[in-house]
From Swiss-Prot:
It comes from the Bacteria. It is found in: Cytoplasm. Belongs to the gamma-glutamyl phosphate reductase family. GO terms for cellular component: cytoplasm. GO terms for biological process: L-proline biosynthetic process. The keyword Transmembrane helix does not apply. Its main location: cytoplasm. It catalyses: L-glutamate 5-semialdehyde + phosphate + NADP(+) = L-glutamyl 5-phosphate + NADPH + H(+). This is Gamma-glutamyl phosphate reductase. It comes from Ruminiclostridium cellulolyticum (strain ATCC 35319 / DSM 5812 / JCM 6584 / H10) (Clostridium cellulolyticum). Keywords: Amino-acid biosynthesis, Cytoplasm, NADP, Oxidoreductase, Proline biosynthesis.
Length: 432
């Protein structure tokens, strides 16, 4: 099937998807969960082929870790689907109700975006999370995963499509693209596709934006920071730093740079290094850091690097203002944390750091749709428009205005025969 037909089919299916009941969608989600478990052997075999091929092609270790889709990860995504089913139905929610006049009522109501094209890295679990979120939100989805996972993605897409069509979803609601040429062709299909979500480097996201007329929701690098303030609880700071860096290194919310206030650096860094050494973390540092602990010399490139590995860069700063300046210069707008006992400083940091997720005394690894209670996420948006931070169900919704009248015409108001009331109502659209 060519890409134009794939996109056209999704456009047709989007009309039916928008009208599906919550019951039908939840039943389809349950069918996906059952099908993943029933086909786990076939899925793991396909994934093993991808892993073996990628190892021969010398794929980096962190990327191999992302690529692996074993029984544990299958069970994890199944649990994620069940959590998604437990969330309330997102479509048809009344966001606002205004009484314009007697028997003239305006409702702002949630609805699907339509057809979403999502380009993501070599993480098969992401394919399941993305497709199920789109299903729950009533959207059609066109998927392009990393080529390293091509066999796994084919099997997963087939399993999901077969299970959901049997459950009553329209054919064509999900589609898989397999090449860069497919992506370039998809970017031209603005008559069918309503939104593109690219997950990858800043350069990649910029390329997508520059080569498409379709709106783009950016998901770029995760250059995350922890700043240890002079008033921090240093034991807490150590725990947060180690968790932020090492709990799972191959993800975009892992910390890459640690900023330490000069006033506590000599007391804090030796103990931190001992903990990082236990995890075999490679440490790069500026000259001041090197005077305190043994590190490799850091360059400007280190401050701008998303390692996705057991590597961290450390810089000593004069205080919070310098830390914020560093984050503004080198950060990606993803997740940044301050560790401090000083509430005023924490509030100031969270207000001034212009990232989608800003934390006080908590690991950067918390910036995740599942951990936020969103069910799952299609990615972390570093854009400021429409959706920001972990993009869950709410980020995949639009809204429409529904006006319910009884023969009213504008001329009556223009000639002062009638007057607008413009009263806020505590009423839902399904109560009309």
């Amino acid at each position: 099937m060519d890409i134009r037909q794939l996109c056209g089919n999704a456009g047709v299916a989007s009309v039916k998807m928008a009208a599906l009941s919550g019951e039908v969608k939840n039943n389809a989600l349950m069918k996906i969960a059952d099908a993943l478990l029933a086909n786990s052997k076939r899925i793991i075999e396909a994934n093993q082929h991808d892993l073996e091929r990628s190892e021969k092609e010398n794929l980096a270790s962190p990327l191999l870790k992302r690529l692996k889709f074993d029984e544990k990860k299958i069970n994890d995504v199944v649990e994620g689907i069940k959590s998604l089913m437990a969330l309330e139905e997102p479509i048809g929610k009344t966001l606002l109700a205004n009484k314009l006049d007697d028997e003239l009522e305006l409702y702002k109501v949630t609805c699907p975006i339509g057809v979403i094209g999502i380009i993501f890295e070599s993480r098969p679990d992401a394919l399941v999370q993305i497709s199920t979120l789109c299903l729950k939100s009533g959207n059609c989805v066109l998927l392009k995963g990393g080529s390293e996972a091509k066999e796994t993605n084919r099997v997963l897409t087939g399993v999901i499509e077969e299970a959901t069509v049997a459950a009553g979803l329209p054919k064509g609601w999900i589609g898989l693209l397999e090449s860069r040429d497919d992506v370039n062709e998809m970017l031209k299909m603005d008559q069918f596709i309503d939104l593109i979500i690219p997950r990858g480097s800043n350069d990649f996201v910029r390329y997508i934006m520059d080569n498409s007329r379709i709106p783009v929701m950016g998901h770029a690098d995760g250059i995350c920071h922890v700043y240890v303030d002079e008033s921090a609880d240093l034991e807490m700071a150590k725990k947060i730093t180690v968790d932020s860096k090492t709990q799972y290194v191959a993800v975009c919310n892992a910390t890459e740079t640690l900023l330490v206030d000069r006033a506590v650096a000599k007391e804090f860094l030796p103990g931190l290094k001992a903990e990082l050494d236990k995890k075999n973390v490679e440490i790069f540092g500026d000259e001041e850091t090197a005077d305190i602990i043994e590190v490799k010399p850091a360059s400007d490139q280190d401050w701008a690097t998303e390692y996705l590995d057991y590597i961290i860069s450390i810089k000593i700063v004069a205080g919070m203002d310098e830390a914020i300046k560093h984050i503004i210069t080198y950060g990606s707008g993803h997740t940044d944390c301050i560790v401090t006992k000083d509430k005023a400083k924490a509030v100031n940091f969270m207000n001034l750091v212009d990232s989608g997720n800003v934390f006080w005394n908590a690991s950067t690894r918390f910036s995740d749709g599942f951990k936020y209670g969103f069910g799952a996420e299609v990615g972390i948006s570093t854009s400021k428009l429409h959706a920001r931070g972990p993009v869950g169900l709410d980020g995949l919704l639009s809204y429409k205005y529904m006006l319910i009248g009884n023969g009213q015409i504008v001329d009556d108001y223009a000639t002062n025969k009638r007057q607008f009331k413009h009263e806020r109502m505590n009423k839902q659209i399904d109560e009309i």
